Amino acid sequence: MALNMNAYVDEFMEALEPFMKVTSSSSTSNSSNPKPLTPNFIPNNDQVLPVSNQTGPIGLNQLTPTQILQIQTELHLRQNQSRRRAGSHLLTAKPTSMKKIDVATKPVKLYRGVRQRQWGKWVAEIRLPKNRTRLWLGTFETAQEAALAYDQAAHKIRGDNARLNFPDIVRQGHYKQILSPSINAKIESICNSSDLPLPQIEKQNKTEEVLSGFSKPEKEPEFGEIYGCGYSGSSPESDITLLDFSSDCVKEDESFLMGLHKYPSLEIDWDAIEKLF
């Protein structure tokens, strides 16, 4: 409330400032020839000095009604303007600051075996070739460190066949050891457990079956196993295997011998042909 009163007083004094100056000559002449003032006395416009000739301060009781009306009108206009400004300030919405979008920001590069936590850290993991389980390699501050940790583990497990994020750096060996000693020991034990992982062996057998068109038998059956009888061993001088016709299986199965005499031999007798000529 006190602040509003001070504001109105300041505006009132600013409005009275043009009328608070009178000329020195007029003030001295008025002081030398004072005029009696009565309650019914109203000065005329001819008796009022012009504003431009006033240079000294005078009392408010010496203002004309026209000047007082002008002062009231000016005060009223200033009050209306101040109220409008206050109302417009309350009605207008405050500008909200938009977030600055950096157009030049580069997108985050994705690395193999690396993922980001919700709080900003980077985690490196690798899948083991034997049982396809994940091995946690550690948490790092940057994505590059996590990618380098994955490369070190992958190069130890898979060798030169590993797909790396930084192949030139890892294969040349110009890098610092990022993996912890416990992770290194675990990777060494995994590498020493088996030379060739089990899934790779199964994959190799399946590849051979696809190329040949049929599955490879575990063991080729022998002649004696097919006909249910044994056979004599081969002589050391030749690789021809001789059948043992004296065995019980041949005697019992007479159809075996009858089949030999049923069909003629298809071999050419060259001696008989030479006798004809």
Curated annotation (Swiss-Prot):
One of its GO terms (cellular component) is nucleus. The gene is ERF057. This is Ethylene-responsive transcription factor ERF057. It is found in: Nucleus. It holds the Pfam family AP2. GO terms for molecular function: DNA-binding transcription factor activity; transcription cis-regulatory region binding. Gene3D superfamilies: AP2/ERF domain. Belongs to the AP2/ERF transcription factor family. ERF subfamily. CDD domains: AP2. Keywords: Activator, DNA-binding, Ethylene signaling pathway, Nucleus, Transcription, Transcription regulation. One of its GO terms (biological process) is ethylene-activated signaling pathway. Probably acts as a transcriptional activator. Binds to the GCC-box pathogenesis-related promoter element. May be involved in the regulation of gene expression by stress factors and by components of stress signal transduction pathways. Its main location: nucleus. Residues 110-167 bind DNA.
